Each structure stands twice: as C-alpha cells, then as structure tokens.
A protein has these predicted regions:
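Flexible, glycine/charged-enriched surface loops at secondary-structure junctions
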Residues: 1, 52-62, 89, 110, ...
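Rossmann-like adenosine-cofactor binding region
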Residues: 60, 91-173
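Adenosine-phosphate binding glycine-rich loop
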Residues: 141-260
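Short glycine/threonine-rich loop-to-helix capping motif typified by GTGT followed
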Residues: 70-77, 134-136, 157, 240-246
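Glycine/serine-rich phosphate-binding loop and adjoining beta1-alpha1 elements at the start
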Residues: 1-54
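Predominant activation on well-ordered alpha-helical scaffold segments within soluble catalytic domains
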Residues: 10-14, 38-46, 76, 93, ...
Length: 263
C-alpha cells in the first residue's frame, strides 16, 4: 500500500498475481504497513535530532509536518507523546482539525509550512517538496520525513549539505513499511514462526536508526551529502548480500493462517 491504494486494492490485485503483500491474513493490523512506516520515521527523526542537535529527548522540539495521512498522523502522535511542539498542514482540513484537537498542534497553510522557524521539517505528503521554490524558505536544520523522492533534484541535496542542513535520506527513513511487508511475507514460510513477527519487526525498524547514524557519520567524515552516502551504503549491502530469502506464493495454504502478533 502507498498513497492512493489500500488493503482492499491489494487484495483485488491478488486475484491476478501472487506477487503482492500487505494483506489482511498476514498481521493483526490488517496488512497495512503504514504503522511500521510511521514508527520508522519517528526512529529516524529521533536519530537525526540526537546527531545534529545533540539532544537526548524530543521535549519542546519544534517539528513542521507536511501531510497528515496514514503515516504523517501517526508520526505526529509519536512526536506529541514525546513532548514535541507540532506545526501541521494537510490538504484535508479534517486531518488538520483533528491534530489541533487531539495533539495540540498549530495549523498552518501549505505555503507557510516551509518557512517556519522550527528544528525539523518532516515532509510526509507527495514527492519533491524540496525544490527551487521552497529550498530558500527552509529554516529547519533537519529534514526527516516519510515522503518519497523528497529532493526534486540531486542539486537540492547538495544545497542542503552546503548549508549544514542534515537531510535524512527518504528511502532510509521510510523503510519501516517495506520491512513490515518483508516479515509479513516471511510468515508464509514454513520454517519461520509467526510468534517471532512482532519482535523481529520491531528490532529491524529500530535498526533504521543505526543505519542512519552510519550515513551521518560517513557523510560528515567525507564531507559528502547524506543522499550520496545512502546510495553507497545500499550498494555495499547489495554487493555483500548472500542470503536472498524468497517467500512462498500467497495462494499457498500457509497464507490462510491467522496470526496473533501485531506491530
């Protein structure tokens, strides 16, 4: 699932192909990986704050969240619980109203979200929020959010790096969802115990923080933008990989099992 698709959509696709995941038989959260995506974004944002701002907690941290969908709103909930001060915008006014009501967030317009004097800008809407029109408005020292393809071009990543803005690469930050999908598929394997799902999933999502720290450290040491280092780390892991697990088909009998663990 992603923007514009849902679990029912994926189930419909499963009538035509076995190459799908994120379905209701695989986890107690209905197969929707967005809870894991959101928690991974929270872990990533926390790691970025620790590295850049040398802070051990998020109390009083000012965060601007662009987009309050399935992932963005859950991220806002995690941040609110951690004591952060939230500034939010969304194209759906009801989502903004809910955040104001439930999370004591401050509502701003889509145009204002970029220029706020905040610690973190968390893009959680559609792609390319960092572009020619917005990059000079940013006052945040950290960019960490769930949106895909956050940099309109690589040049924008170079600009952020040159200005000392810590950019947490998008496909690392939002990896929680695909990690969840991996373990949902793995539960279909006869040699994997579904009882391990929650523990294994949580450990891997928390591990996103360690990956980001490696990227941040190498970026600073080499004076190379984080998005470049992220690609290098990914390539290194691909090249060094030896155990390529393949799941069974979703129409196998194992796919009909029910599971008691949830994310």
């Amino acid at each position: 699932e992603d923007s514009g698709t849902s679990v029912p959509d994926i189930l419909k696709m499963s009538q035509r192909t076995s190459h799908i995941s994120g379905v209701d038989k695989a986890s107690d959260h209905g197969g929707d990986p967005s809870p894991s995506t959101a928690y991974g974004v929270f872990v990533s944002l926390r790691e970025a704050v620790t590295y850049k701002l040398k802070r051990t907690n998020l109390e009083g941290l000012k965060v601007a969240i662009q987009g309050l969908g399935n992932v963005g709103y859950r991220l806002a909930e995690y941040l609110h619980k951690a004591g952060a001060e939230l500034f939010v915008t969304d194209i759906v006014q009801a989502n903004v109203d809910r955040a104001v009501r439930e999370l004591n967030a401050t509502a701003v317009t889509g145009e204002q979200i970029f220029s706020l004097d905040v610690d973190v800008f968390a893009p959680c809407a559609l792609g390319a929020p960092i572009n020619d029109q917005t990059i000079d408005q940013l006052k945040a020292t950290i960019v960490a959010g769930a949106a895909n393809n956050q940099l309109a071009t690589t040049a924008h990543g170079q600009i952020l790096h040159g200005r000392g803005v810590l950019y947490a690469p998008d496909y690392v930050v939002n990896a929680g969802g695909i990690i969840d999908v991996y373990y949902q598929r793995k539960m279909l394997s006869a040699d994997y115990s579904a009882e391990n799902y929650s523990t294994d999933l949580a450990a891997k999502v928390e591990g996103i923080g360690a990956t980001l720290k490696e990227i941040f450290v190498r970026s600073e040491a080499k004076d190379v933008p984080t998005f470049v280092i992220a690609d290098r780390v990914a390539e290194e892991r691909f090249n060094n990989g030896s155990n390529h697990w393949q799941p069974t088909r979703l129409n196998d009998s194992a796919a009909t099992r029910s599971y008691s663990k949830s994310v």
